[in-house]
């Protein structure tokens, strides 16, 4: 087994074939991409899967270029065994098969210092999705002893509490957990 170049997501089996797999960023599970004759072919499969899952922010083995249609693809020095479109469709099917939930997401508490907001931030899986704020609370500029230590004005705090009560009936379990995290952080002294 001679490793002339190590590729991300690629390993060589004892008998010489190359395999590729990728870890799903939100599900924290490995997705099997297949067995290949060369390390380069396995690396191209990894790159296509990374682009499908992470979009233009993907860490790839080969340079990524924009096509005329506006989609990302890996710059291919050698002709691949499959066309980029058919490879993309195959990998997309494998990724869908590995995900029981079609819209997995990562939700976390985040502080936006640029616009003085604290809130719940969510990133859904997929190359075409972008991170969004689920809920934001505006932090006040003046620190008030009667308000929360983070500087929420009492008026903003009352408005937020009223909105929370109205929306509480329709909030999912994941969102409810995120709201509790915000509440604990705001009430923490």
Swiss-Prot record:
Tissues expressing this chain: In flowers.
Protein family (similarity comment): Belongs to the AP2/ERF transcription factor family. ERF subfamily.
Cellular location(s): Nucleus
Protein's name in the database: Ethylene-responsive transcription factor SHINE 2
Any Gene Ontology biological process: ethylene-activated signaling pathway
Database matches in PANTHER family: ETHYLENE-RESPONSIVE TRANSCRIPTION FACTOR SHINE 2, SHN SHINE , DNA BINDING / TRANSCRIPTION FACTOR
Keyword ATP-binding belongs to the record: no
Species assigned in the record: Arabidopsis thaliana
Primary site of residence: nucleus
Signal sequence, start to end: none
Highest taxon above the source species: Eukaryota
DNA-binding segment(s): 6-63
Cysteines joined through disulfide linkages: none
Gene: SHN2
Pfam families: AP2 (PF00847)
GO CC aspect terms: nucleus
Role played: Promotes cuticle formation by inducing the expression of enzymes involved in wax biosynthesis. Probably acts as a transcriptional activator. Binds to the GCC-box pathogenesis-related promoter element. May be involved in the regulation of gene expression by stress factors and by components of stress signal transduction pathways.
Keywords: Activator, DNA-binding, Ethylene signaling pathway, Nucleus, Transcription, Transcription regulation
Molecular function per GO: DNA binding; DNA-binding transcription factor activity
Transmembrane segments: none
């Amino acid at each position: 087994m001679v490793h002339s170049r190590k590729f991300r997501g690629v390993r060589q089996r004892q008998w010489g074939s190359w395999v590729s797999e990728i870890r799903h960023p939100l599900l924290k599970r490995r997705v099997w991409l297949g067995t290949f004759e060369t390390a380069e072919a396995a690396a191209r499969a990894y790159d296509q899967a990374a682009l499908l899952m992470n979009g233009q922010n993907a860490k790839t083995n080969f340079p990524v270029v924009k096509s005329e249609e506006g989609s990302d693809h890996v710059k291919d020095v050698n002709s691949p065994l499959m066309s980029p479109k058919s490879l993309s469709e195959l990998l997309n099917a494998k990724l869908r098969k590995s995900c029981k939930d079609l819209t997995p997401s990562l939700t976390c508490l985040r502080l936006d210092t640029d616009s003085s907001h604290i809130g719940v931030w969510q990133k859904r899986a997929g190359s075409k999705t972008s991170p969004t704020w689920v809920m934001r609370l505006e932090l006040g500029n003046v620190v008030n002893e009667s308000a929360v230590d983070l500087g929420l004005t009492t008026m903003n705090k009352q408005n937020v509490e009223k909105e929370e009560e109205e929306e509480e009936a329709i909030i999912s379990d994941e969102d409810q957990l995120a709201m509790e995290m915000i509440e604990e952080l705001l009430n923490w002294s």
